[in-house]
């Protein structure tokens, strides 16, 4: 039986083993937030779309003196293979200024492993409708929507359909904006090409599931740097968040072209976004994402800003949390531009070392 067969026939909570994993995931999530001193509430918000439950974290702003132009909450949407807990200390810092919600997308983390359409265009629409139904259920008039990577792609797709529900659109190193680079494979060695084609035959995180209980140890060996940003529980969290029915991976794979690009990139439709929606791109100077092309395509638009955080990689919110929060809150503070500190990266002098 293939992973696709599993994804279409067996729900995440169908066995006691899976239920145990879901409980352990909730515990790991709780430990990460607790270690960071974050006071949060958690609930599974049920929406009409296939009775999907969306894991929702709420952190209320306790700073009564916070004065922002925007009265609307910050909503965080994670990237591929991630979940609410990976926003980490960024949530704590953002909540000093505004109420914060973070959700696990359907098919990821502790949300339902919803089966989406096998048609990429339909599947994307279903995901956007799930986000909209969540907004309605939460009774949020508008949102300051912050999306990272794949979450940035989906946030933009949402803004294209529901611009009146967006106060600010903030894209943290978003995936899926540029066209396919045909020279990518040419730059790989024969061994890298062979490995690349093997990976494409499976769901992206299949290897993590295949090693079973060794998953956390494998993650620790591959990403020892994560322990510098989170507690050691992050390795259990990432493994458990991706050990369930991989419906989120399946939709990501269906929307992607060789995983690295989108089949329907935002380069073809970003210009359709309502010009009254302020957009801020926040890229990591050392990210693998082609931010230079993104900035060239969209950076000169009147309602768009482009910022590069030097020294940060793809996970800009974790690599330089202080600068990331300054840029996000800058949008809420005076509507479009503005930082909490006057320093700014000189975009003409960026030195980028791709990973």
Swiss-Prot record:
SUPFAM superfamilies: alpha/beta-Hydrolases. One of its GO terms (cellular component) is mitochondrion. GO terms for biological process: lipid homeostasis; phosphatidic acid biosynthetic process. Pfam families: Abhydrolase_1. One of its GO terms (molecular function) is lysophosphatidic acid acyltransferase activity. Signal peptide: none annotated. Residues 73-319 form the AB hydrolase-1 domain. It comes from the Eukaryota. InterPro entries: AB_hydrolase_1, AB_hydrolase_fold. Belongs to the peptidase S33 family. ABHD4/ABHD5 subfamily. This is Abhydrolase domain-containing protein abhd-5.1. It comes from Caenorhabditis elegans. The lineage of its organism: Eukaryota, Metazoa, Ecdysozoa, Nematoda, Chromadorea. The gene is abhd-5.1.
């Amino acid at each position: 039986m293939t992973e696709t067969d599993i994804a279409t026939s067996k729900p995440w909570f169908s066995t006691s083993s899976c239920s145990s994993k879901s409980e352990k995931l909730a515990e790991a999530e709780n430990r990460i937030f607790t270690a960071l001193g974050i006071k949060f509430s958690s609930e599974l918000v049920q929406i009409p779309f296939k009775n999907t439950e969306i894991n929702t974290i709420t952190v209320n702003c306790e700073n009564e003196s916070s004065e922002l132009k925007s009265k609307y909450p910050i909503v965080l949407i994670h990237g591929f293979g991630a979940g609410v807990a990976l926003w980490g200390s960024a949530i704590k810092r953002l909540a000093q200024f505004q109420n914060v919600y973070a959700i696990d997308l359907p098919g990821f983390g502790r949300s339902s492993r919803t089966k989406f359409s096998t048609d990429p265009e339909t599947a994307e629409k279903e995901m956007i409708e799930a986000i909209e139904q969540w907004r309605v259920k939460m009774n949020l008039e508008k949102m300051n929507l912050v999306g990272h990577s794949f979450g940035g792609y989906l946030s933009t797709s949402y803004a294209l359909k529901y611009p009146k529900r967006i106060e600010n659109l903030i894209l943290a190193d978003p995936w899926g904006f540029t066209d396919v680079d045909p020279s990518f494979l040419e730059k790989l060695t024969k061994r890298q090409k062979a490995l690349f084609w093997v990976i494409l035959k499976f769901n992206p995180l299949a290897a993590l599931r295949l090693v079973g209980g060794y998953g956390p140890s494998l993650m620790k060996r591959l990403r020892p740097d994560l322990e510098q940003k989170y507690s050691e529980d992050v390795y259990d969290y990432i493994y458990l968040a991706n050990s369930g029915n991989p419906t989120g991976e399946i939709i990501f794979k269906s929307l992607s072209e060789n995983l690295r690009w989108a089949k329907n990139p935002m380069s073809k439709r970003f210009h359709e976004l309502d010009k009254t929606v302020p957009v801020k791109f926040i890229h990591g100077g050392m990210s693998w994402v082609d931010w230079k092309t993104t900035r060239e395509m969209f950076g000169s638009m009147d309602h768009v800003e482009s910022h590069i955080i030097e020294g940060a990689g793809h996970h800009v919110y974790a690599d330089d949390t202080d600068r990331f929060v300054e840029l996000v809150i800058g949008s809420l503070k005076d509507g479009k531009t503005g930082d909490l500190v006057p320093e700014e990266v000189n975009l003409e002098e960026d030195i980028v070392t791709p990973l």
